[in-house]
Amino acid sequence: MRRVYTDFHIHSCLSPCGDDTMTPALAAGLLKLAGYDVAALTDHNAVGNCPAFFRACESYGLTPLAGMELTTAEDVHVVCLLPTLERAMDFGRAVDAHRVRIRNRPKFFGNQLYMDAEDNVTGEEPDLLPNATDLGLEDAFALACEFGAVCYPAHVDREANGILAILGDLPEKPVFSHAEFREPDKREEYLIRYPRLAPLTPLFGSDAHRPDAIVDPCFTLEIADSADVAAAVMERLRSKP
């Protein structure tokens, strides 16, 4: 067994709330410099910058995961981590069919830039990405699982788009076994307020949208000592808490 430093919640300049300088390549380089072993790119309702992130991670020696921060019909943010880049691209196309199409207004919401691994802009997403899909919470998890994803609610310790703030509590029988915290020190406080969190395995995600928001590693995950680190991480996340 071995322990790896992870951050499973990173945005790029494809997310309109992300800084235009947060290119997939820059994110990969900064994550490596910060000391991470594994990181996931999780833009809002999109996976279009994952290929560039993967190529950049390969050059930097960082293990990448392809992911998405999916917005459910209830406006809850859910992190979806996919087993391979190919499955992630397929999942992205599936989610596209459930997006509510509203034209992006870059001057108001921000740019939504597709990039290559050399920091070149290859296109721009015309429709606003972060708004809610038509997928309810359980339907979103069911769809993601069809593509082999590991899913869990994002930033449960945040008011905006956090499942606890939106729904008031966790479902009595949740379809997920993890919960993401932005600030690990808040977990004990939240366990007192929301006892249903207790059985869930806590994960850390910085939710970084800007280069200066990539923080020093503070969370490790114990995985099998395997040459395929990404597969070992996914296997660990699928295991029961």
Residue ranges and their predicted role:
Residues 1-8, 12-30, 34-36, 47-90, ...:
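Charged catalytic cores and adjacent phosphate/nucleic-acid-binding surfaces used
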Residues 39-40:
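A short beta-strand/loop micro-motif in the catalytic core of glycosyltransferases
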Residues 82-125, 169:
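Active-site gating loops and adjacent loop-to-helix segments of metal-dependent hydrolytic enzymes
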Residues 111-146:
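Alpha-helix-centered segments that form part of catalytic cores
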